[in-house]
Curated annotation (Swiss-Prot):
UniProt source species: Mus musculus
Gene name as annotated: Sord
Cofactors that this protein relies on: Zn(2+)
Family: Belongs to the zinc-containing alcohol dehydrogenase family.
pH dependence statement: Optimum pH is 9.0 for sorbitol oxidation and 7.5 for D-fructose reduction.
Source domain of life: Eukaryota
Name this protein carries in UniProt: Sorbitol dehydrogenase
Catalyses which reaction(s): keto-D-fructose + NADH + H(+) = D-sorbitol + NAD(+); xylitol + NAD(+) = D-xylulose + NADH + H(+); L-iditol + NAD(+) = keto-L-sorbose + NADH + H(+)
A GO molecular-function annotation: zinc ion binding
Amino acid sequence: MAAPAKGENLSLVVHGPGDIRLENYPIPELGPNDVLLKMHSVGICGSDVHYWEHGRIGDFVVKKPMVLGHEAAGTVTKVGELVKHLKPGDRVAIEPGVPREVDEYCKIGRYNLTPTIFFCATPPDDGNLCRFYKHNADFCYKLPDSVTFEEGALIEPLSVGIYACRRGSVSLGNKVLVCGAGPVGMVTLLVAKAMGAAQVVVTDLSASRLTKAKEVGADFTIQVGKETPQEIASKVESLLGSKPEVTIECTGAESSVQTGIYATHSGGTLVIVGMGAEMVNLPLVHAAIREVDIKGVFRYCNTWPMAISMLASKTLNVKPLVTHRFPLEKAVEAFETAKKGVGLKVMIKCDPNDQNP
């Protein structure tokens, strides 16, 4: 594959709140353990939109121009001198988090918790919404021929669902409540069913998203209106015939987390995936006296191989989640679409010569 010419690396860059621009960046120079990738498909995540709108997420503040994007797949064009398992032409999915050191968290297999981790499009680290991108080869996973680039890009949000279901110990025959029918809620629904959940209820404010949830496998849906958390929990129990053993909360909304506590079966598990306000009011006594375990989720770890196997074996289907596609040259328009909440997953196609999924 021919090496890219200088100046061909079109990139989508956030400069601060409300300020994103398409700019040409230099082609990255490789280290011995890196690969250079020609990017193909990059999904827009809610965090990308948040950095564009607000210039920060919590303590992560955009202080200098930063390339956006972290849900991605592409083709290897060049490898570093120590890379043995990949070669030019290989199609890969990118795990965006790469530990910079082997610390106590890496040693126990929970490298997602290491505080110094490199993570695409998290200040100050650049993302991969660009033509060409450099990444550590150990965190690039070869895609089988049966898995498309778009599916490869969707492994990132799919990994959140896998990790959340692992944290909740979803298993054969479980009844599961998923709060939120956005992209993360949808992949959590797919994974829960793939892991053997007998029945899954999905809640959301949006009727159209709940319709999509039914299409991809939800047994029941509840459109949340002005009901109290206790009333929503009662509806969940009525639909399932009993309280769910596992609740996975994907919105971050205070009332939804409260619903999760009230709804979950005694001795069950509430998994917190959505990130909302730093301080929230919760009925903790209600959780304590019924021994409802509350577990947090921060990104994911050790999920890419399982996700690839699930996609290759057709255990689950993420293709219906992609509702909009834009070429890289129209990335700003793509972000406007994502900001409006139109559709579900917006995908940007970075290779001008290949717009196929």
